[in-house]
Amino acid sequence: MTGVRAYNVRKRLKGAQPKLLDYVKNGGTLVVQYNTLQDLVLESPGPYPFKVSNDRVTVEEAPVRFVKPDHPLLNTPNKITAADFEGWVQERGLYFTHDWDPRYETPLASNDPGEPEKLGGELYARYGNGVYIYTSYDWFRELPAGVPGAYKLFANMVSAR
């Protein structure tokens, strides 16, 4: 897993990227937390292209839609329901992605009231024998706040196969 903004501040990730993607290709799971548009060390930190945007969902109570309700990220090992998005603090997510390669799956969507739906908060792709996940949801706020649903979702990401 890479931390928030790692591809903005850790310049050595540019050289380490082939090793990280080899890890995924050989059966590993890599979860990349959000990055900003500015000063990315790579055009796209994933195995397939996507772009980072300034899109965000700032209303923490904004509904989350299950675009792919049978997706493994929403079912394994924890069954995720709308209740798992209750009690979030400050916002849902930030720097959502756009213009992603069709090999990425987008199991979730959300938006602030009166704004268009945003699908780019969570990208999931099989790469070789492994899984690559890019997440724009704000785990760095939800986990320290002890939001139970955030822990369930996070566990699903790190255990994805």
Regions found by a protein language model. Name each.
Residues 1-51, 116, 129, 135-142:
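Helical hinge/lid and interdomain linker segments adjacent to catalytic or ligand-binding clefts
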Residues 27-29, 52, 58-62, 101-103, ...:
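Short, surface-exposed, polar/charged, turn-prone segments marking secondary-structure boundaries
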Residues 12, 56, 149, 153:
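Short acidic-hydrophobic sequence patches enriched in Asp/Glu that either
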Residues 33-127:
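An acidic, glycine-rich "communication" segment
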Residues 119-122, 134-151, 155-161:
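Short, surface-exposed patches at the edges or C-terminal ends of soluble domains, predominantly
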